[in-house]
Design a protein with these regions (language model features):
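Active-site-proximal specificity loops/subdomain of glycosyltransferases
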Residues: 1-35, 44-47
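Short beta-alpha junction loops
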Residues: 9-11, 67-72, 182-183
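Short aromatic-enriched loop/helix-cap "lid" or pocket-rim segments at secondary-structure transitions
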Residues: 18-19, 47, 75-80, 189-192, ...
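Internal, well-ordered interaction modules that form the hydrophobic cores of assembly/scaffold domains
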Residues: 29-56, 64-66
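Short acidic, S/G/P-rich loop/turn micro-motifs used as interaction or catalytic elements
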Residues: 39-43, 71, 148-151, 156
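Short catalytic/ligand-binding loop motif for oxyanion handling, primarily in non-cytosolic enzymes
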Residues: 42-44, 71-76, 185-188
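Conserved catalytic core of nucleotide-sugar-dependent glycosyltransferases
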Residues: 50-150
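C-terminal catalytic/acceptor-binding lobe
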Residues: 113-278
Length: 281
């Protein structure tokens, strides 16, 4: 059985405040864990073989991550390495105004990847290992050894992204590493969602997956699990995903409010939003 639903240990409904509890269920000492956001929409063929091989070969890193498309820190890395040439600079901040907050950039980035997928050229983005430390990043896809969480019982703060990506490895005097020789595509941050939902990007990924008969059974099983989860948490399903509750990120909520009221459109930049292949692609 490839997929099992495991209840959140504190009985919390889906939402940001519930995520941290799962780490207490992911600390078996002889196990490697790979965690995905629920809106990872594409994995490069042989993804698991590549990521797990790197994870096994590099036990000193606390977290190992693939190259994540639509992740601000990964976008900065692609820009720095000359793989992409965006119209504006993307900074190393995981909440970068462009790499995290600009929906039109996310659409351009997805279209860039989709073009490479169709041409069978995603390996052109591969750039080896890149170590990162003391820098928070969006943990859209991460891998760890259960034995590394076991000493502290897998207890992670509600602000689990900062804990897992920066605070815990700092306390352990460990670094993290992006293994960019395999790729995962992350659909959207909530700052981008309203725009990307109307872009047809999700349907393009679905079309690509539909053309892979070897995963048809897994897609059907995933659909059954999604329907079971929606039946269990109908209020979340009605929201179209995880609802935003008592977030402390006031800046994020302001952006969300502007999206919902149609005011977050980057009108002054719209004609200048573009993403070109970089010189090193």
């Amino acid at each position: 059985q490839r997929v099992r639903l495991i209840a959140q240990p504190d009985g919390k409904a889906p939402g940001v405040p519930a995520i941290h509890g799962f780490h207490r269920l992911a600390m078996d000492v002889d196990t490697i864990y790979i965690r995905f956001d629920d809106d990872i929409v594409w994995l490069e063929p042989c993804f698991f073989e590549a990521l797990l091989r790197f994870r096994v070969d590099h036990p000193d890193y606390f977290l190992v991550m693939p190259l994540v498309i639509n992740n601000a820190v990964c976008s900065n890395l692609l820009q720095t390495l000359g793989k992409i040439a965006p119209w504006r600079h993307i900074h190393t901040n995981c909440f970068d105004r462009i790499g995290w907050g600009q929906p039109e950039f996310a659409v351009a980035l997805h279209r860039f990847l989709l073009d490479l997928i169709r041409r069978g050229e995603t390996a052109r983005l591969h750039s080896g290992a890149h170590v990162v430390a003391l820098n928070r990043f969006s943990i859209n896809c991460i891998s760890w050894f259960g034995r590394d969480l076991a000493p502290f019982g897998g207890e992670v703060r509600v602000e689990e992204e900062e804990d897992m990506s920066a605070a815990i490895p700092a306390r352990l005097r460990r670094t993290n590493c992006f293994c960019t020789d395999t790729i995962a595509a992350h659909f959207a941050f909530f700052t981008q969602r309203a725009w990307i939902d109307r872009s047809g990007i999700l349907e393009q990924y679905a079309g690509i997956l539909a053309g892979r008969p070897e995963i048809a059974g897994l897609l059907a099983e995933a659909g059954e699990i999604r329907r079971a989860a929606e039946a269990r948490y109908p209020s979340v399903a009605a929201e179209g995903g995880v609802p935003i509750r008592r977030s402390r990120w006031r800046m994020q909520l302001r952006i969300l409010g502007r999206i919902l009221t149609g005011k977050y459109s980057f009108k002054k930049e719209r004609k200048r939003v573009f993403l070109n292949p970089g010189p090193a692609l």
